[in-house]
């Protein structure tokens, strides 16, 4: 598989994630060295959902991120293209909806805030996905995007690149039910826009005031923006 076939069709991506659903959460904890829970908490704090607000958690997977967002008292719905992932999170008591990030099954101006964590890379046309998220968000509403990015310390960046190339695939073979998905993960991270490039893409696709905070030396970048009022 060359470059993890980064031009996969949406159905292929969904099928790939269907196969990892049952072990997805534990695999992410292992591969992130336990940082995933902290990243979810910081995403919730940045989005700052309020009691009574409606929040869309796109590419929610097993809804572990939706569960974290729900701690705020907001009404949070998990939306994902992979039925297998949603099924794997069936025990989590949050609303779940199957949906394509390029054609969201919600009316205009439905949500007070929208977030997507580690899923924007997997939307075939991620700029269309950003516009769709803006469409379903109320004027003045908020966006938070947590996504793997480029480490800001050069030496650490070299170590991280080696981790993605040499260590992540064999670890995934041990802990994941579908190691191919994590080869795709590594390749898609390396091909992803840098922090400033993603901020520019957010600003030209229905949002404004895009900025970011680097987490764990920039392994993850937490972008935020608002929809024009």
Curated annotation (Swiss-Prot):
Q: Please name the Gene3D superfamilies in this protein's record.
A: Vaccinia Virus protein VP39
Which protein is depicted?
Answer: Demethylmenaquinone methyltransferase
Q: Which GO terms describe its biological process?
A: menaquinone biosynthetic process; methylation
- Cystine residue pairs: none
- Which keywords are on file for this protein? Menaquinone biosynthesis, Methyltransferase, S-adenosyl-L-methionine, Transferase
The protein's Enzyme Commission number: 2.1.1.163
- Report if keyword Transferase is assigned: yes
Catalytic activities = a 2-demethylmenaquinol + S-adenosyl-L-methionine = a menaquinol + S-adenosyl-L-homocysteine + H(+)
Q: In which pathway does it act?
A: Quinol/quinone metabolism; menaquinone biosynthesis; menaquinol from 1,4-dihydroxy-2-naphthoate: step 2/2
Q: Which PROSITE patterns match?
A: SAM_MT_UBIE, UBIE_1, UBIE_2
Q: Write out the similarity annotation.
A: Belongs to the class I-like SAM-binding methyltransferase superfamily. MenG/UbiE family.
Q: Tell me the GO molecular function terms.
A: demethylmenaquinone methyltransferase activity
Residues binding S-adenosyl-L-methionine: 62, 80, 100-101, 117
């Amino acid at each position: 598989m060359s470059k993890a076939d980064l031009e996969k069709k949406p159905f292929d991506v969904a099928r790939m994630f269907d196969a990892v659903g049952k072990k997805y959460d534990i695999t992410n904890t292992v591969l992130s060295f336990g940082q995933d829970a902290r990243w979810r908490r910081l995403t919730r704090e940045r989005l700052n959902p309020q009691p009574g607000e409606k929040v869309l958690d796109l590419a929610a997977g097993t809804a572990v991120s939706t569960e974290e967002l729900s701690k705020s008292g907001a009404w949070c719905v998990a939306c994902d293209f992979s039925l297998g992932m949603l099924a794997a999170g069936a025990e989590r008591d949050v609303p779940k909806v199957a949906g394509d990030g390029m054609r969201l099954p919600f009316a205009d101006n439905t949500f007070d805030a929208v977030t997507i964590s580690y899923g924007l890379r997997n939307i075939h046309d991620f700029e269309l996905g950003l516009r769709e998220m803006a469409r379903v968000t109320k004027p003045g509403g908020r966006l938070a995007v947590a996504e793997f990015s480029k480490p800001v310390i050069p030496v650490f960046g070299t170590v991280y690149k080696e981790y993605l190339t040499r260590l992540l695939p064999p670890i995934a073979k041990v802990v994941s039910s579908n190691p191919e998905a994590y080869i795709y993960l590594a390749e898609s991270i390396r091909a992803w826009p840098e922090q400033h490039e993603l901020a520019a893409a957010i600003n030209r696709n229905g949002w404004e005031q895009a900025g970011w905070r680097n987490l764990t030396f920039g392994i993850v970048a937490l972008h935020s923006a608002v929809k024009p009022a």
